[in-house]
């Protein structure tokens, strides 16, 4: 569903978890290292950005771009027209890359596993699950 209250919670919890500046890099490294640990085959999607080394400047920059896209998408949760346009843009970007549907689930699961490290018991797991389902569903369907 990702109703108005869930969107509000996700938007505000994301701002707290993702933070600013160098904190974002740490968040990204934690997330991507978790993804690569649990689904090492995903690393192959990132060959052109030195995905074999999550600490390389090239991969860190790419990881920040990906999370920047998620940041923008989450920030638009309360503006349906802009949110829909962002999802359409992300869908076109991801269609070119032939990303398996399963990989979106891996991303969501790993993100949900990392968020408690930043939000603790404030994490609204249901709100995040619902809203991430809407986001990833629109991108890969």
From Swiss-Prot:
Binding site for heme b: 94
S-S pairs: 2-131
Entry keyword set: Disulfide bond, Heme, Iron, Metal-binding, Oxygen transport, Secreted, Transport
Primary location group: secreted
GO cellular component: extracellular region; hemoglobin complex
CDD domains: Mb-like
Origin species: Tubifex tubifex (Sludge worm)
Signal peptide: none
Highest taxon of the lineage: Eukaryota
Complex formation: The giant hemoglobins of worms are formed of a monomeric subunit and a disulfide-bonded trimer. This subunit is monomeric.
Globin domain span: 1-141
GO molecular function terms noted in the UniProt entry: heme binding; iron ion binding; oxygen binding; oxygen carrier activity
Record's protein name: Globin, extracellular monomeric
Subcellular location: Secreted
Family statement drawn from the similarity comment of this UniProt entry: Belongs to the globin family.
